[in-house]
């Protein structure tokens, strides 16, 4: 089993959701602020006379759990849906999971997903 976590631009949330909803049993999307290694966005002030560099970028984090056999399909779908070709597209991390328990059904392992 794998835990896939993708930090993406917030405007790509719908595209990623559409891309993975048929591939996974469920997923979680969290919104927040992040700071990657890339350049920060420059923001103009209200009157347009000044600007400042944002300390953080708005990001969305998509988390899902899948069988090992499905991991590459899900990773590919997320990468394709979130790609803009510019810096700041995000990052996808994959972790191995030792076990899982569905609290409601009491199913364990891959059946819990």
Positions of the model-derived regions?
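Positively charged, small/polar-rich N-terminal and surface patches that mediate targeting and assembly
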Residues: 1-113
